[in-house]
UniProtKB/Swiss-Prot annotation:
Taxonomic source organism: Methylobacterium nodulans (strain LMG 21967 / CNCM I-2342 / ORS 2060)
Lineage: Bacteria, Pseudomonadati, Pseudomonadota, Alphaproteobacteria, Hyphomicrobiales
EC number(s) on file: 2.5.1.78
Keyword terms, alphabetized: Riboflavin biosynthesis, Transferase
Protein name: 6,7-dimethyl-8-ribityllumazine synthase
Listed pathway(s): Cofactor biosynthesis; riboflavin biosynthesis; riboflavin from 2-hydroxy-3-oxobutyl phosphate and 5-amino-6-(D-ribitylamino)uracil: step 1/2
Binding annotation for (2S)-2-hydroxy-3-oxobutyl phosphate: E92, T93, R134
SUPFAM superfamilies named among the record's database cross-references: Lumazine synthase
Family membership: Belongs to the DMRL synthase family.
Metal-binding in keyword set: no
Amino acid sequence: MVTPRRDSGSDRPSLKDARILVVEARYYDDIADELLRGATEAIAASGAEAEVVTVPGALEIPQTVAILVEAAMRSGKPYDAVVALGCVIRGETGHYDIVAGESARALMDLSVLLRLPLGNGILTVETEAQAQARARVSEMNKGGGAAEAALAVLALKRANAAEHPGRTIGFTPRRAAETAE
């Protein structure tokens, strides 16, 4: 029987030197305030440093992440993880489906391609009341949850690097010569 491994947090590598990029969409200011508060509190509790950048809406988040992550890598000060925050509330047209789906897909593509831990805190809801409940730190705290997700994957990435120096986390295909042996 396989026993799932639960992360207690106590054996996590230190995240004190981690640089976390937080990109927030402020289309709904009151919701954005709560999402950001939850995320920055979680990041501060981990000892990591947050850099917050604001964009108008959810579709601007992935392109902003791509631009800033690339610039940070070129500068020699790469981000260790990203947290995306925003809110998309269903309206009367199909715009909701495009914004919700495309922003999530683009963020996942970036995360996998760059092997960059990313917490997606873009709420996709039917009503403003649902958004408020999910955003509020005192209720569902989805901003904090997105930050915790990014930090957990970062801790996993660092633990893997410590256990296997010189090897990156993720899939590495075998070369033909290795499989012939």
